[in-house]
Amino acid sequence: MQLTESLGIVLFNRNYREDDKLVKIFTEVAGKQMFFVKHISRSKMSSIIQPLTIADFIFKLNDTGLSYVVDYSNVNTYRYINNDIFRLAYASYVLALADAAIADNESDSHLFTFLKKTLDLMEEGLDYEILTNIFEIQILDRFGISLNFHECAICHRTDLPLDFSHRFSAVLCSEHYYKDNRRNHLDPNVIYLLSRFQKITFDDLRTISLNKDIKKKLRQFIDELYHDYVGIKLKSKTFIDNLVKWGDIMK
């Protein structure tokens, strides 16, 4: 059992026996790991095992069983996110997506950095819906999905109107619409934004502002992509869907 130090983000915890907990932490150096916390009611760790807690952890990794947290420091609990039910719902969904996208014990420092930066920007007050859309699009490759929103799948032109084709898992230009009579008939702005989301940098995020109509169209199409290509529906996403139904009442 080796001693390791790493930044980590708590994904979730669950009960284990009467007074113990299992805590899954996404670590920067060792991927997602499950940790055993004994006697949680008397443990100093009771305050840092909640989801959306980030800290520097020292832990013992066990290759064959449960691992153990030895110590922690520099704890951040994303207070702004936790004080807003909508922001919290989207942040929880992003956590769940990261958890679903890679296997446990598999190091992925790039995804860790992307997740942390997404949460940091949500905490700063940036648009959590747009941040979530960008996270959803850029994480598709972790599910083995590669979609082309940039150029026509047939002629590679980018200067004509484009529409998405499930048949080609890519966009078609107007001269090749006939190749798929069941193309999506998407708003051109949706195609443009998805192409931009695939390669956008964090510095660019601060300049994006979208109206409600475009946000709704993005949400509907990304939901369609996840249904058709990824095939998962997370509980945290269902909670968001329910929130949207009565969101105007709460805002």
UniProtKB/Swiss-Prot annotation:
Alphabetized InterPro entries for the sequence: ARFGAP/RecO, DNA_rep/recomb_RecO_N, NA-bd_OB-fold, RecO, RecO_C
SUPFAM superfamilies xref list: ArfGap/RecO-like zinc finger (SSF57863), Nucleic acid-binding proteins (SSF50249)
This protein's record includes keyword DNA repair: yes
Signal peptide boundaries: none
The organism's place on the tree of life at top rank: Bacteria
Record-level GO BP terms: DNA recombination; double-strand break repair
UniProt keyword annotations, A-Z: DNA damage, DNA recombination, DNA repair
Recorded GO CC terms: bacterial nucleoid
Function text: Involved in DNA repair and RecF pathway recombination.
Protein family (similarity comment): Belongs to the RecO family.
PANTHER family hit by this protein: DNA REPAIR PROTEIN RECO
Protein name: DNA repair protein RecO
Organism: Streptococcus pyogenes serotype M1
Underlying gene: recO
